[in-house]
């Protein structure tokens, strides 16, 4: 028997200390990693519920275990809500993460040795889109597309490569690309060469849900995403698809890749999807994009170069070469000033992947805590202050004090 009032702080002080320390970090640091966000208390409550106890292999109404009548309700709510948000014919909410969602698509439609086409990791793509060390690069023949001289996707080159190599799967989507993607152009190319067209909107899903970024669902055979990042849910994945692909995708997830779904996480996804259907969520995403534009413009005014020249989303890459500092060093010194970013390669980066010449900055988390125009401008100036004098301890101390003053005014969890 368990007593409900016995908590982690009583049973495991070491873990409780780590949780409390991380809570303090999140409250007192400005989070600028584009793939991170803050889940709502409602999402976290669902994820910490008794649904974690239930095994439910299969799908609603077709389980391999008894006693699934209540988790069926939770999963069906998640499915119905995410279909409504994105206008999808069908949806699978069971993927444990975005990588699993992408793997399931490949399992459903490809055999080892088939050719796939995705955006080059070195120019903004994601490792699951064909990186040699990833399963996608090990099992399939990979053809990559990249950027043109203006650091925008080179659609003409992509089209030429598609006709030359005739891939079975074409992937659109990126992890470090700030501009809007022309999904309709990709779809036409995929149709012309007879390829399945998959879009990975892991980074852009929240923006798409709110209508501030193009929706690929009308154009794609399959759309994958994570449920955290800009969508602001629990860590997990989803797959949206045309109805004719539902059976193949569902079979690829279970029993193809996964066993029992995480019902507590699926319930948390459902809660996040309901939140994403609210007017407040749309206003939030509008501010995410506005904050990103303000940060990019301010950094440009301070002498930093934004890759692609601008952002049209929530994310940007900053080229640091003119400042004589690497991405690795910038990540460290900004972290010392309590601003969390990640080092990131820029196109044609001369540095090693763990060093890099750039950093990636995103605005979803800072916007969740209430930052608007003024705070976005202040944050960008604080970033620039650090990067102008990265080895000056007094400068770092002064910026850290300003960061604390700002975060104290905008707590994440009140």
Curated annotation (Swiss-Prot):
InterPro entries: PyrdxlP-dep_Trfase, PyrdxlP-dep_Trfase_major, PyrdxlP-dep_Trfase_small, Ser_HO-MeTrfase, Ser_HO-MeTrfase-like, Ser_HO-MeTrfase_PLP_BS, SHMT-like_dom. One of its GO terms (molecular function) is pyridoxal phosphate binding. It is found in: Cytoplasm. Keywords: Amino-acid biosynthesis, Cytoplasm, One-carbon metabolism, Pyridoxal phosphate, Transferase. GO terms for biological process: glycine biosynthetic process from serine; tetrahydrofolate interconversion. Disulfide bonds: none annotated. Its EC number is 2.1.2.1. It comes from the Bacteria. Pathway: One-carbon metabolism; tetrahydrofolate interconversion; Amino-acid biosynthesis; glycine biosynthesis; glycine from L-serine: step 1/1. Its cofactor is pyridoxal 5'-phosphate. The record marks 228 as: Plays an important role in substrate specificity. Its main location: cytoplasm. PROSITE patterns: SHMT. This is Serine hydroxymethyltransferase. It comes from Variovorax paradoxus (strain S110). The lineage of its organism: Bacteria, Pseudomonadati, Pseudomonadota, Betaproteobacteria, Burkholderiales. The gene is glyA.
